[in-house]
Amino acid sequence: MENTENSVDSKSIKNSEPKIIHGSKSVDSGISLDNSYKMDYPEMGLCIIINNKNFHKSTGMASRSGTDVDAANLRETFMNLKYEVRNKNDLTREEIVELMRNVSKEDHSKRSSFVCVLLSHGEEGIIFGTNGPVDLKKITSFFRGDCCRSLTGKPKLFIIQACRGTELDCGIETDSGVDDDMACHKIPVEADFLYAYSTAPGYYSWRNSRDGSWFIQSLCAMLKQYAHKLEFMHILTRVNRKVATEFESSSFDATFHAKKQIPCIVSMLTKELYFYQ
């Protein structure tokens, strides 16, 4: 039988084995045009996937086995949603910043939205280039309303598969059963962002060497199933449940055995987001 490993997206951690627990639309469709983002521009938008697998020796960070599975899964998923997908592999921190700066300067006026996926090691508020850390704030700031005017008022989605600390979630038993155009001409520059983090602040984020990370597996599965049926926040809620209930780490090291994970969604979206009209 093929051996696979579960890892976490922090700078370093002992390996552990995986275990999965098995237990177009119009007003007539019920979508309010006043309360939902306009998604019928000529193009859906860009989806930038930054996939950092191999890191400079000086960083002391291990290779992220399984991340190529995530990148391929994401590419297929967002291409099916009609995004223009651009995959970038093993970027330094300088290259990440330069890429994001250049993308923000593009003309997005014919695009409905923007998606950026970051697959790497991380800490709270930080994503790692192959040669060192970058503040997430620096990456996302290029797309603020006052910096990227052609995306103003449009949804900007940042999906982040990375650790946010070194805490481990032991889980807890439960007996509940596992079952209009804007009237104002000014909007906050931080409006219309959504950050989908793979894990809660301070915690490890788990990744499987064969199947990819728990979070990206679940996100792609739920998007494939519900992208043409549900609003995006509802889809992300189902992602949270899938990660929380269907995955658990298995390790010979008791410290890393039977651990859980819950994604964390931070939304500054001002309207409902449907990937269909």
Swiss-Prot record:
Q: According to its UniProt record, which reaction does this protein catalyse?
A: Strict requirement for an Asp residue at positions P1 and P4. It has a preferred cleavage sequence of Asp-Xaa-Xaa-Asp-|- with a hydrophobic amino-acid residue at P2 and a hydrophilic amino-acid residue at P3, although Val or Ala are also accepted at this position
Q: What is its EC number?
A: 3.4.22.56
Q: Name one GO cellular component term.
A: death-inducing signaling complex
Biased composition, class Polar residues, residue ranges: 1-10
Q: Which residues carry this modification: N-acetylmethionine?
A: 1
**Propeptide residues, per UniProt?**
1-9, 10-28
Has keyword Acetylation? Answer: yes
The protein's GO terms of the molecular function aspect are: cysteine-type endopeptidase activity; endopeptidase activity
Q: What is the protein name stated in its UniProt record?
A: Caspase-3
Gene designation: CASP3
